[in-house]
UniProtKB/Swiss-Prot annotation:
This is Phosphoribosylformylglycinamidine synthase. Mg(2+) binds at D707, E746, N750, D909. InterPro entries: Class_I_gatase-like (IPR029062), FGAR-AT_N (IPR040707), FGAR-AT_PurM_N-like (IPR055181), PurL_large (IPR010073), PurL_linker (IPR041609), PurM-like_C_dom (IPR010918), PurM-like_C_sf (IPR036676), PurM-like_N_sf (IPR036921). It is an enzyme of class 6 (ligase). In the N-terminal section; belongs to the FGAMS family.
Amino acid sequence: MSPVLHFYVRPSGHEGAAPGHTRRKLQGKLPELQGVETELCYNVNWTAEALPSAEETKKLMWLFGCPLLLDDVARESWLLPGSNDLLLEVGPRLNFSTPTSTNIVSVCRATGLGPVDRVETTRRYRLSFAHPPSAEVEAIALATLHDRMTEQHFPHPIQSFSPESMPEPLNGPINILGEGRLALEKANQELGLALDSWDLDFYTKRFQELQRNPSTVEAFDLAQSNSEHSRHWFFKGQLHVDGQKLVHSLFESIMSTQESSNPNNVLKFCDNSSAIQGKEVRFLRPEDPTRPSRFQQQQGLRHVVFTAETHNFPTGVCPFSGATTGTGGRIRDVQCTGRGAHVVAGTAGYCFGNLHIPGYNLPWEDPSFQYPGNFARPLEVAIEASNGASDYGNKFGEPVLAGFARSLGLQLPDGQRREWIKPIMFSGGIGSMEADHISKEAPEPGMEVVKVGGPVYRIGVGGGAASSVQVQGDNTSDLDFGAVQRGDPEMEQKMNRVIRACVEAPKGNPICSLHDQGAGGNGNVLKELSDPAGAIIYTSRFQLGDPTLNALEIWGAEYQESNALLLRSPNRDFLTHVSARERCPACFVGTITGDRRIVLVDDRECPVRRNGQGDAPPTPLPTPVDLELEWVLGKMPRKEFFLQRKPPMLQPLALPPGLSVHQALERVLRLPAVASKRYLTNKVDRSVGGLVAQQQCVGPLQTPLADVAVVALSHEELIGAATALGEQPVKSLLDPKVAARLAVAEALTNLVFALVTDLRDVKCSGNWMWAAKLPGEGAALADACEAMVAVMAALGVAVDGGKDSLSMAARVGTETVRAPGSLVISAYAVCPDITATVTPDLKHPEGRGHLLYVALSPGQHRLGGTALAQCFSQLGEHPPDLDLPENLVRAFSITQGLLKDRLLCSGHDVSDGGLVTCLLEMAFAGNCGLQVDVPVPRVDVLSVLFAEEPGLVLEVQEPDLAQVLKRYRDAGLHCLELGHTGEAGPHAMVRVSVNGAVVLEEPVGELRALWEETSFQLDRLQAEPRCVAEEERGLRERMGPSYCLPPTFPKASVPREPGGPSPRVAILREEGSNGDREMADAFHLAGFEVWDVTMQDLCSGAIGLDTFRGVAFVGGFSYADVLGSAKGWAAAVTFHPRAGAELRRFRKRPDTFSLGVCNGCQLLALLGWVGGDPNEDAAEMGPDSQPARPGLLLRHNLSGRYESRWASVRVGPGPALMLRGMEGAVLPVWSAHGEGYVAFSSPELQAQIEARGLAPLHWADDDGNPTEQYPLNPNGSPGGVAGICSCDGRHLAVMPHPERAVRPWQWAWRPPPFDTLTTSPWLQLFINARNWTLEGSC
C-alpha cells in the first residue's frame, strides 16, 4: 500500500474572502466561538518504494508553499489543539480523484515527481471555546464547514486512498425468464432505474421473446438510454387532453414551426445543437496543429451554432457541482455539432425559490415555508450554482454574455404551494462551425471508436434515470448522491483543443463522427456513435481513474469531460500526436463491426489486442452487454398520456389601498427577477476569446442590463451572431398559453436591438421545464406548446432545437411542491454588422435624448402574474399578453431599419417590472435623470406603470425624432413620445408623471440603490463584505470614468506593407491557458509572424526559441491554478531541464521581448523576470532547475473572488518598450482574474520599483489617478499597480487584457470621442513591440 504523505500549510495572510465568510458563518451558528485558525493539508500518495529524497521533498514543499515565505510548509501540523479547542479536518469524498488532484499530479509529472499519483487537499480548523466543546457543537461546526454531498469529515489524517470495500460486480443476470416482471421490478427498485409500468411490461415481454435474461448492466443501460431524460417520451408521445386525441405529438408540432420561417437551418433537431447559414469570413488558424506552427489567414464559410440545456436535478442536490457539469455538458454539445465546432460564448439562467437572505427582509417571502433536507436551499442555489457555472466558464475560457435569474415561492388561492425547490440551471451556448463539417459520416466497418477526454470515474451513475423520477425526493438519498457529478474544466479545455486541432487540420478533418457523453455514460454515447452499424467495445482499453470500477460503472457512469468519435485507421497517428501535444487522453476502445449489435467485452483479466490477437482466455470472455441496436435505439411504440386540464383558481389582485408608486418600487426593484444582476456578472468572464461585441454590462457604470449578446464569427470581421433570451414562467400559473407567447415576445424584443439578417432568419431553442406528469400539468404544457407554435407561425420565426425537463417537482414532507411551468426561448440569428447594436443606457442627458414608447398590445394594462403582483404574494387574474403578433413583426422590422440607419441611441424592452422599471433601468445605466409623462387616461397609475405588456422604449436625438416617429406610425404602430432625458449624475432627478400628474420624483442614484440592494446582499455572501460596501457606496456618487489620449499619443495604424518584415513571436500556452487566440490576433494585427507554441513543444524539443524575437505568455488558468496562480506553469519552467533552459536562453538574449498577461503576468513574477531587486543584474536567473526567489507575487483579489470588470488604467513613464509613447494615457481595458493582488516582498522593494518606473501601469479612478478603490482597482493591489516591467523594459507583465481590446468593437463602453475611433489605442502596445524589433535594438 502506497504511503500518504502529509504537508501542512499555514495561511500566508492573504487568502481572499473565504476564511472571513467561514468565520462569520461559524459565529452565526456558534455564538460561544472565540477563535478560528486554519491550515491546509496536502495528502500526497507516493508510489515509489523509497520515500522522497531531500531534493524531491524540497520540490514538493516549494509547490505547496508560498515562494515569498520560507517556512509556511511543514510535515507536522501547525495546529495543536488545547482542551477547549476543537480540531476538525474536512475534504473531498475519496471515492474518486478530484479535478484538483488531477491537476496537481499533472504539475508533479511536469516537474519530475513521477511517484505522485494522487494529491487531495483537506482543510483543517482549530476552533477555540471558553469551555470544552460538546458533541452537539462539533456536529454544528461540521455541518457549517463542509458540503455533505461532495465532502466528508476526516477524524484522523488520511492514511490510504484505497477503498475500504470493493463494489459488487453487478454483472449477473436478472431472472426475467424465471420470475417474470417481478425480477425487473426488484432491479428497478434496487438500481433506481426509474422505469414506469409501461417500461416494465415492455422490457419483460422483449426479453421473454428473446428467451434470455438481461444482465444487470443491460438493464441499467436500457433504463438510462430510454429514460424520459434521453428519449423524450412525453414530447414524442400520443397525448389525449380532456378526452381529445391530439393530431400531432408536441415534437411534431414544434417541428412544424419551420414551415413558416426561412429555410436557413443547416442543422436542426440533431446533435443537441442546431446551426444556421452563416457568412464567408477571414480567420487565423495554425498551419499544422500537430506541431508548433505559424498562424495563417484563411477564408471560409462559417455557420452559426446554438444549443441550450438544463441541469436541474444535479444542481438542486449540489448546486456548485451540478452547475459546473451542466455548463460542461452544454459546451460539449457545441463541440460535437456535426464533425466538430468552435465554442464561442455561453448564456446562463437560474430559477430558485424564495431566498430568505439572513437579515434582509423581502416581504413576499413566507417564513413558514419548509424546505427538504435532500435539496439545497434556494439561497445556496442562487450563489453556488452561479459560482459553479461561472467558475467552469472562466477556467475553460468561455465568456457568459446573457442570462436571467428568477425566484418564486407562493401559495396559490387553492392552497397549493408553487416554488422552485427543484431549481432551474439553464445553460446556452453559441458557436461556429466550418461549412465542410456539417454532416456526420455514417459508421462503417473497421472505423475506430475513440474516447477523448478524462478517465472513467465512479461519477454520476444513474443521473439520466435519477433526473427522470416524477417527483424529486421519491428516490433514495444514496442514489441521489450517486447521480451527482463533478466538473473538470481544465480537462474539457484540453479536449476542446484536440477537437479544434482536428477541425483545423490542413489535410481535412479526420473526425468522421462525434458525440458528447452525457446521461447514460459510455453506454449511451457509444450506441449513438455506432448506430446503426454496431460496434464491439473492450473494457481494458478505457483509461480508468479508479481500478476498482466494475463493468456497470465503466459502461454507465456519466463522468464528465469525455467525447466519443469515429475515425479511420490511417488517421490514428494524427489523433495520437495531437492528444500528446495537448496532454489529453485518447483511448481507442473498439471498432465498428457492421453487425448492428453493441457488444461490451469485459477483457480486463485477459486484454484483447487491437489486431484481435492476445493470450487465449481460459474461458470465453464475459460480455456484460450484447444488444441489437435496432432493439435499443430503433423506433419504439409511442407511449400514450391521458391528460386533464385543471383551470387555476383565480382571485383579483388586491393591492394595499393608497399604495404609492414609490412604495410599489420599494418592492418591485428588489425582486430578484427585476433587480440588478451585478452579483452574477462581476464574477464571470465576459471577454475571453476576444470575439465579444456585446455582453451584459452597459454604460459608464457597467450596469448589467443588456438585452442581447453579440459575438463575432472571427476577429478579422464585423460579421457575427446575436442571441437573446425570453422566459415568463410566473404567468404560466394563470395561463400557460400566455406564458409561451410572452417568452417568444421577450426573446424577440431583446434580440431586436442587434442588427440581424431578417426576422424570418431567426431560429430558437425551446427549453421546457415542467412537472408534466402531475395532474393538470401535462395539459398545461400541451396548451403552452400549441400557443408557442401558433405565435411563431404568425411571427415567421421557428424552433430548431431544445430540451425538456419534465420532473419539476419535489417532495417537501408530505407535500408535493411543483415549480411553475417554464419555457425558455433562446433566439439567435446572424449579424451582418456587429457594431450596429443599441444598448439600454441613456446616452444624451440634459434633455438631448427624447424617449419614445412603442406599445405592442396598445390599450392593455394587465397586472396578472407581474412582478408587482408577486411582490404582494399574489398572482391576480388577467396576465399581459401579445394580443397582436403582427405588431411585433412590424416593430421588429422598423427597429431594424433604424439600427441600420444609426437613428437610435438606446433601447430597452418592457418586461419584468413594467414600463416604469424599463424607464428607470435606462436611467440607471446612463447615470442620468429623465422627465416623462405617460398619457393614458382612465387607467389607474399602477396599472399604467407596472403592467408588463410587451413593448419597446427608445432614445433618439432631436434631429431624428420626427423621422423615427413617422416610421413607426406609418407602420400602424402605437408610438408615444414620453419625454426626455434629465441632468447627468447620480443626483439627477427622475420625474415620472401619468396624465400630467407627477407620481414619482426622486434622484436616480437613490432609486438605483434600491434596484442594486438585493444584488449587494447576495454579493456580501460571496465576496468580502468590505469590498461590497465600498462598491455600493461608490455607485451612489460616481459620475463615470474619464478616458484620456494625450496629444503625443502615437496614431496607431495597422501595418499594411505587403511582404514587409514580420518579426516572429511565439504565443506560448500551457495546460489550461485560454487566451491564446486573441493574443495571436493582436500580434498578427500589429504585423508579426505569429506562432502557436505549447509548453509540451518546448519540453519535447519540437521547437526552440532561438528564431523568435518575442514570447507572449497568455492568460488563463494553467493547471487550473490549483497550487496558486501560475504556480504549476512556473514549476514546469523551473524544473523541466529542456523547457527551462530554452526560456533562460531566450531571456538572456538582448534582442528579445516578452509580454505576460494575466496568468502570464503571474508566471513572469514567479520566475523573477519582473519584480526582482532593481539593483541586481536582471539577466541572471539563478542556477538551472532552481526556483527563483521572486520579489513579488500575484495573490487572491481582496474581494476574495474572480473579478470581471471593464476598468481603467493609467500608463506611466518608464522603460517598458511596449508602452513607449503611451505615457499619460488613461484607457479602459478588460480585467478578468481571481488572483491579481500584487504582494511585494517588502515595502522597500515596492518603493524602488515605483521610483524606477518599473510599474508603468496602474488601475485608475474616474479622474484618471492611480487608485486602490474597489472595484476601480479590481484586485486591491497597493498603489493601484496593474503592471510590472523589467529594468531594461524588455519584459512586461500586466494583469489586465489589452489583447482583448485591440479592436474598437471589443470595448464594453465608448464615450465620445472614443465612439468614433476606427483603431483602438491598445493596438499601439503591440505595434511598439514590432517597431522595437525592427529597430534592431539590443
